[in-house]
């Protein structure tokens, strides 16, 4: 049986997606034929995606402002059932039931949506808006199906596109391996790794990644990347301010009194004390990220990012906590500021005995990142903010929810304030956010000290806020002493936690955040953008399922994305020829500029030494870096200053390394192992072939490209080299030696009678300014 679409397009029942139909099967068994399938498909792809998820769910859900109404939906992102089928089936039934209700022979659903009947959300849809038309079409279709008239008035057809990755080339396995080893371990692939991948393809990648993820460089990158997300290094007043004066006043400044009498010279002693303090502060800043590294390194469930009942301490930070004497025997080297071990803090003791921390266990109630002092200092509170910043960041970091996107901004704040005594608890446009945000803010109520971290509000918690809890569950009074642990336990059971951690891994690998569902239905590219979002979302959820099955081992998520076509997509030129696919594929493929840290590591991996200038924090900010405080977003698109830095880097690195490489024995060279400086283009056919082979090697080492010796790219580089040498030979008075500034350190200026060293230096400069080097 065939249905006619809106424009006469035939749609067979077999073409209607089986997984979606299963997920939204009607509870009403009277309508299970093809007509009902059309209603299902239209509901999922149109009504739910465009209306329900965007306009209804924020209030009509457990814990939402309309949770006591008869129209209560379930959030699919919190549904752990296969394909989120349980929630989608529930929502379809709820919509269908509401669509059949009438008031004065008009649809109750449409009247409420436009604010013509009593509706707490007022007019969420404007009459004749795109979303209203979708909902009206659905109501008409449901009533027609109920009356057996659907075939006379068919629902619009939902267009099918080509397979999402049709026309997309995947990255060569060698290039994929190079990308992964540079990204995760700051090195080029080893010969045995390349051989394994060449032999077994993607099957070998898991084993290779197992080795990569045991390297120290991987954990350095992991900490750096998660700081981009948590920004935990960016709090004010010095690192030691995380240890509150009220609880650690006698120990947090231990470096000022540390015995350095063995250093006789006063200036040297003062310098040593400065270094001691700097190392101590750096050790404190690293603590939250060392927790993350410890979890991953030891294959612990990544749920410990919020449930760990310990923090990480080094010999230096242990002194700050006043715990060094009891821990010193557990350290391998008590003078190493960056050796960390897991430690449980005793409950906090205040200078005022009445304000000691209450703890039934006798320990500080650790809850992973949620309770570490540095995280709490990074996201402080005020008398007016009332921990709402902390609640907002909790949702963003651990559940992937941007609370500010739950509802539109209040249109007339003065009018709302005048109308309601407590707008955040009474005004619908305020409640939609605050009923989610404020209960979590209340969870943090005992962490209210502005200058420190722990300390309940002296006047008790606010009465004009929704009570402490999480998503409709109230915090039991007996759990208040461990409220953050209670929150953590609820967090890791929420399917959004696993999905969010997988999204973080995507950001770490690609430098981009996952796609959000498009909102503007009148955007001509809406369908293409939605298809791109759905494809990426499906992949994210599939990797999240593997992540959960692997007991939340973060390495599983990394491997999942590494093998994903979203990470491996390479040449999209063919697909981009279709304008409709241009919007669909706009975010596909890796094309983000390397961060300052990544660029320095890439230079070091290829040339054996870093450039060095981007290690300066202020200079790095000019190249898109962050300080985790004022500058918190990395600039991914190069501007004028960044372009100038790229040119300077290319010139400096080539100058420092080309003559140096030629000065080494051929077997030890990175750049020019099979060519000497006495060989110039145009001298012989054999010589030109050797030069082209040297260029192929350079392209592989510097750019990660495996170009054929006869390729256009190799010809372009060859012509550049030949042109420079030809131009030099046509000039008079040029020196026959390399520049003084580019000579190897401690050596004489190397002879360069044919200008080949300088020409090769120009070639390397050219390659270092290529997109393949500067971008990932």
Please give the residue ranges for each predicted region:
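Aromatic- and Gly/Pro-enriched helix-to-coil junctions and flexible linker segments
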Residues: 5-232, 241, 319, 464-515, ...
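His/Asp/Glu-rich metal/cofactor-coordinating catalytic motifs and the adjacent surface-exposed loops
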Residues: 22, 136, 148-159, 168-181, ...
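Substrate-binding clefts and substrate-entry loops adjacent to catalytic sites
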Residues: 514-516, 520-524
């Amino acid at each position: 049986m065939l249905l006619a679409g809106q424009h006469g397009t035939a749609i067979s029942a077999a073409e209607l997606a089986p997984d979606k139909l299963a997920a939204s099967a009607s509870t009403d068994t009277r309508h299970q034929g093809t007509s009902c399938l059309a209603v299902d498909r239209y509901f999922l792809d149109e009504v739910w995606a465009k209306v329900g998820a965007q306009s209804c769910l924020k209030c009509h859900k457990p814990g939402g402002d309309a949770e006591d109404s008869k129209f209560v939906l379930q959030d699919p992102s919190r549904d752990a059932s296969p394909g989120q089928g349980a929630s989608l089936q529930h929502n379809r039934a709820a919509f269908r039931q509401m669509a059949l209700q009438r008031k004065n022979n008009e649809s109750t659903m449409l009247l409420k949506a436009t604010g013509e009947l009593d509706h707490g959300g007022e007019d969420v849809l404007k009459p004749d808006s795109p979303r209203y038309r979708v909902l009206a079409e659905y109501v008409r279709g449901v009533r027609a199906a109920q009356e057996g008239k659907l075939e006379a008035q068919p629902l619009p057809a939902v267009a099918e596109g080509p397979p999402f990755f049709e026309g997309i080339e995947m990255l060569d396995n060698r290039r994929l391996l190079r990308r992964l080893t540079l990204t995760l371990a700051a090195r080029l692939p080893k010969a045995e790794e390349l051989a394994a991948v060449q032999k077994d393809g993607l099957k070998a990648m898991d084993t290779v990644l197992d080795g990569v993820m045991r390297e120290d460089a991987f954990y350095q990158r992991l900490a750096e990347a998660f700081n981009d997300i948590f920004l935990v290094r960016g709090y004010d007043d010095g690192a030691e301010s995380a240890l509150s004066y009220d609880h650690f006043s006698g120990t947090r400044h231990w470096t000022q009194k540390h015995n350095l009498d063995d250093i006789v010279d006063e200036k040297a002693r003062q310098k040593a004390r400065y270094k001691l303090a700097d190392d101590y502060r750096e050790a404190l800043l690293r603590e939250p990220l060392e927790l993350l590294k410890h979890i991953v390194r030891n294959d612990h469930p990544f749920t410990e990012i919020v449930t760990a009942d310990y923090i990480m301490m080094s010999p230096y930070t242990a002194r700050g906590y006043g715990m060094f004497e009891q821990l010193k025997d557990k350290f391998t080297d008590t003078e190493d500021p960056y050796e960390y071990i897991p430690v449980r803090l005793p409950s906090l003791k205040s200078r005022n005995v009445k304000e000691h921390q209450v703890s039934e266990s006798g320990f500080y109630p650790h809850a992973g990142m949620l309770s570490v002092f540095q995280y709490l200092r990074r996201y402080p509170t005020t008398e007016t903010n009332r921990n709402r910043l902390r609640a907002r960041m909790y949702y963003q970091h651990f559940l992937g929810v941007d609370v500010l996107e739950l509802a539109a901004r209040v249109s007339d704040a003065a009018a709302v304030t005048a109308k309601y005594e407590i707008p955040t608890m009474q005004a619908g446009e305020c409640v939609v956010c605050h009923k989610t945000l404020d209960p979590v803010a209340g969870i943090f109520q005992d962490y209210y000290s502005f200058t420190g971290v722990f300390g309940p509000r002296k006047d008790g918690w606010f009465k004009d806020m929704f009570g402490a809890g999480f998503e409709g569950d109230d915090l039991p009074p007996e759990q208040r002493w461990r409220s953050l642990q209670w929150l953590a336990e609820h967090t890791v059971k929420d399917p959004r936690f696993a999905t969010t951690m997988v999204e973080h891994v995507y950001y770490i690998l690609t430098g981009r955040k996952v796609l959000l569902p498009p909102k503007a239905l009148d955007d001509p590219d809406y369908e293409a953008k939605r298809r791109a979002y759905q494809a990426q979302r499906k992949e994210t959820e599939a990797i999240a399922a593997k992540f959960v099955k692997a007991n939340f081992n973060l390495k599983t998520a990394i491997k999942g994305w590494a093998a994903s076509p979203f990470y491996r997509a390479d040449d999209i030129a063919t697909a981009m020829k279709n304008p409709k696919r241009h919007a669909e594929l706009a975010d596909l493929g890796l094309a983000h500029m390397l961060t300052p840290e990544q660029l320095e590591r890439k230079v070091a991996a290829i040339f054996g030494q870093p450039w060095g200038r981007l290690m300066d924090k202020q200079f790095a900010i000019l190249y898109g870096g962050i300080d985790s405080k004022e500058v918190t977003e990395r600039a991914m698109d190069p501007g004028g200053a960044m372009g100038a830095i790229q040119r300077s880097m290319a010139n400096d690195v080539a100058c420092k390394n080309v003559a140096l490489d030629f000065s080494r024995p051929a077997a030890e060279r990175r750049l020019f192992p099979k060519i000497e400086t006495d060989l110039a283009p145009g001298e012989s056919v054999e010589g030109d072939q050797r030069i082209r082979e040297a260029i192929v090697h350079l392209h592989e080492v510097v750019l990660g490209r495996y170009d054929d010796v006869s390729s256009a790219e190799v010809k372009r580089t060859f012509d550049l080299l030949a042109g420079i040498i030809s131009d030099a030979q046509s000039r008079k008075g040029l020196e026959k030696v390399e520049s003084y500034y580019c000579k190897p350190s401690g050596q004489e200026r190397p002879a360069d009678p044919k200008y080949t060293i300088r020409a090769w230096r120009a070639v390397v400069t050219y390659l270092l300014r290529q997109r393949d080097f500067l971008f990932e």
